Amino acid sequence: MNDTSERRSNENSESQSNGQTQSSSQQVLEQDEEEDEELTLKYGAKHVIMLFVPVTLCMVVVVATIKSVSFYTRFDGQLIYTPFTEDTESVGQRALNSILNATIMISVIIVMTILLVVLYKYRCYKVIHGWLIISSLLLLFFFSYIYLGEVFKTYNVAVDYITLALLIWNFGVVGMICIHWKGPLLLQQAYLIMISALMALVFIKYLPEWTTWLILAVISVYDLVAVLSPKGPLRMLVETAQERNETLFPALIYSSTMIWLVNMADGDPGLKQSASTKTYNTQAPTAHPRSDSAASDDNGGFDTTWEDHRNAQIGPINSTPESRVAVQALPSNSPPSEDPEERGVKLGLGDFIFYSVLVGKASATASGDWNTTLACFVAILIGLCLTLLLLAIFKKALPALPISITFGLVFYFATDYLVQPFMDQLAFHQFYI
């Protein structure tokens, strides 16, 4: 009887302890979920603010230039990638030419993207660096020279060639150092915004109107496929960078933090620590046969052979309370925990360029009003906000063009062809709502 009562009491105590363990584990899970939600909201809002400012600045520079400098709205030819003219007699021929131009342009973008991924896959870093350096040199020196010259002409500012050469030289050299080497974060961000605006202005000037809208529509679909498709080129690029634990090139990515300190491709810090531990363990010589592998896994490789070898070299260790206190007081060499405030968000410069192309083209081709420009501006920011919200929820690389470009195109055509005529009629008949 006594044995039976003892068994029942033990079973009851075990069931109670199991229930307490399950309830405590559920509480821990709930707390973790709440913390994840708080972090999602916190960093989602923070990242929105971090990217609203540079995107806004880039679009403001483009729109201000379009509204003030007539050079970028004057037709002086087309790019070699868009050989078909839109100055045709029929609408059908113009639509066909714009489709052909957009097809050629998108094909060039796809080929260049695949070439970049292949070069990165096979570690042709010098070729990629040379490619990016040549592009940066053209933007920072040649296109900046054209831009400054047209701005000085517009505002009737007399500047000699020596002064202009000094300005361009200093601007270009400092930009090359900040982008391709090291420099202050704000200066690097300013240069990335500026070269994005210059590239957008080139597209606005030399791309025909219908071709531009088609390119924007198709590039958003391509961006969706390239990032989310399992074999998409941009997804392969990001996954390769994650596998190698490398940062992508600063000339391709706008970063809200130091790009050589914070890597968006970083995973769990515990994975890095385990990877480094595995590397360390594989380098250690094995002094025992493979039959003792289970025991070596349990003690981490510090078996009796290792202890005998250590005692033979440094002698036996006698632990005393004083020595234990002294050891505990020593600073630990554990890797520092990642500061959440240092986590940055990155956006491709191509996204900056196409955002600015949409707003700038709307400003250049709209019916001379600001309503269409402001509508496209707000639409892009709303789309960017939704994209960053999805990024905070899914915690994976997402395309930044589809939502923003779709909203921008819808807002452009709706405002230019519906809202603006309606407002003109209200103003003409002096109706006030």
UniProtKB/Swiss-Prot annotation:
Highest expression in ovaries and to a lesser extent in testis, intestine, kidney, brain, eye and lung. Weak expression in liver and heart. Present in trace amounts in skeletal muscle. The record marks T257, M258, I259, M264, A265 as: Cleavage. Residues 254-256, 343-347, 398-400 are annotated as: Important for cleavage of target proteins. InterPro entries: Peptidase_A22A, Preselin/SPP, Presenilin_C. Residues 70-98, 156-160, 208-214, 368-373, 420-433 are lumenal. GO terms for cellular component: axon; endoplasmic reticulum; endoplasmic reticulum membrane; gamma-secretase complex; Golgi apparatus; Golgi membrane; membrane; mitochondrion. The keyword ATP-binding does not apply. Residues 1-48, 120-132, 183-186, 239-346, 395-398 are cytoplasmic. It is found in: Endoplasmic reticulum membrane; Golgi apparatus membrane; Cytoplasmic granule; Cell membrane. Homodimer. The functional gamma-secretase complex is composed of at least four polypeptides: a presenilin homodimer (PSEN1 or PSEN2), nicastrin (NCSTN), APH1 (APH1A or APH1B) and PEN2. Such minimal complex is sufficient for secretase activity. Catalytic subunit of the gamma-secretase complex, an endoprotease complex that catalyzes the intramembrane cleavage of integral membrane proteins such as Notch receptors and APP (amyloid-beta precursor protein). Requires the presence of the other members of the gamma-secretase complex for protease activity. Plays a role in Notch and Wnt signaling cascades and regulation of downstream processes via its role in processing key regulatory proteins. This is Presenilin-1. It comes from Xenopus laevis.
